[in-house]
């Protein structure tokens, strides 16, 4: 694969800027979710089973222990980003967040923070806290779970916020100089390629620094799993994902960094689509598609040109 020559990928961007590989270490801060505990809603998003992306056992270790454990699993990098991934990693009092984030950046070879959260859980005090780390020279990314820009779909999947909320949070963060990475799902019920391209267009118009693309995973324990088991919902086919994600990438300005272009999960948590079991399948197909149809930005007449070494 030659994805770095076809897409402005985060890994390549980090290597160019730091002069060596930088790896994300995922952390569990013990946070909950306001869309599950009643603060905003109950039941959570219809696609969600946090076990599909988070090791719940991690929450019983300290931040330092988690980072040490994760670093031992990585032998290709010596510098790291601390990634608070599970649940809503800004859903706590600011002093609690400060303590956790400080524990993370205090560990050896940590060069930055990536904080995953909902767009309705980022008050000014949290943005100001993240700016403190940015101003100290740390790489800071605010990763916002948007999934789609269509309010009808957001309501259908029980997100508990609308697109305008995402826009407000993104604009406030970027006005402070914080980098924003938007998480988008391809294959949501009622959405096809046209809707996904509209979402991309609205995200780019709002202003964004990074994007994560994710095929819809139907996972055990989610509300969507019940619809799938009843035959009312199907997982996205690999061909459809490749076409839609490929066109989204081709319509993305070259300066926007792709943090991810596909995602995997393991059985028995993953119910469908089973091609998502293999982390490479989606990337290999997208590599082929972009080689045939054009690189990131090519549909805009602004093709991605990887920097020369």
Swiss-Prot record:
Keyword annotations: 4Fe-4S, Iron, Iron-sulfur, Metal-binding, S-adenosyl-L-methionine
Domain of life assignment: Bacteria
MF-aspect GO terms: 4 iron, 4 sulfur cluster binding; catalytic activity; metal ion binding
Tagged with keyword Translocase: no
Residues where [4Fe-4S] cluster binds: 33, 45, 48
Cofactor or coenzyme needed: [4Fe-4S] cluster
InterPro entries listed in its UniProt record: ELP3 (IPR039661), Elp3/MiaA/NifB-like_rSAM (IPR006638), Radical_SAM_C (IPR032432), rSAM (IPR007197), rSAM_horseshoe (IPR023404), YhcC-like (IPR005911)
Domain Radical SAM core: 17-254
Co-factor note (free text): Binds 1 [4Fe-4S] cluster. The cluster is coordinated with 3 cysteines and an exchangeable S-adenosyl-L-methionine.
PANTHER family given in the database record: HISTONE ACETYLTRANSFERASE-RELATED, PROTEIN YHCC
Function recorded in the entry: In vitro, can cleave S-adenosyl-L-methionine into methionine and 5'-deoxyadenosine (AdoH).
Protein family membership: Belongs to the radical SAM superfamily.
Protein name: Protein YhcC
Gene that encodes it: yhcC
């Amino acid at each position: 694969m030659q994805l770095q020559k076809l897409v402005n990928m985060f890994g390549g961007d980090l290597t160019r800027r730091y002069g060596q590989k930088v790896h994300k270490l995922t952390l569990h801060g013990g946070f909950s979710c306001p869309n599950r505990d009643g603060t905003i809603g109950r039941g959570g998003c219809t696609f969600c089973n946090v076990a599909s992306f988070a090791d719940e056992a991690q929450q019983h270790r300290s931040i330092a222990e988690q980072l040490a454990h994760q670093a031992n699993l990585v032998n290709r990098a010596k510098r790291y980003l601390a990634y608070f991934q599970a649940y809503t990693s800004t859903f706590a009092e600011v002093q609690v967040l400060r303590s956790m984030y400080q524990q993370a950046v205090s560990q050896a070879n940590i060069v930055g923070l990536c904080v995953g959260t909902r767009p309705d859980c980022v008050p000014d005090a949290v943005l100001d806290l993240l700016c403190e780390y940015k101003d100290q020279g740390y790489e800071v990314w605010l990763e916002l779970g948007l999934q789609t820009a269509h309010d009808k779909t957001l309501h259908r999947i029980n997100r508990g916020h609308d697109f305008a909320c995402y826009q407000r949070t993104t604009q406030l963060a970027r006005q402070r100089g914080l980098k924003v990475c938007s998480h988008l799902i391809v294959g949501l019920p009622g959405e096809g390629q046209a809707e996904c391209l509209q979402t991309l267009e609205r995200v780019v118009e709002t202003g964004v620094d990074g994007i994560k693309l994710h095929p819809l995973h139907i996972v055990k324990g989610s509300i969507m799993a019940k619809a799938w088991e009843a035959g009312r919902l199907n997982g996205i086919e690999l061909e459809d994902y490749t076409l839609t994600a490929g066109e989204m990438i081709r319509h993305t300005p070259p300066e926007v960094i792709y943090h991810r272009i596909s995602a995997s999960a393991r059985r028995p948590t993953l119910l469908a689509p089973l091609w998502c079991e293999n982390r490479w399948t989606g990337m290999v197909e997208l590599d082929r598609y972009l080689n045939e149809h054009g690189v990131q930005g090519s549909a805009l007449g602004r093709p991605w040109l990887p920097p020369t070494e």
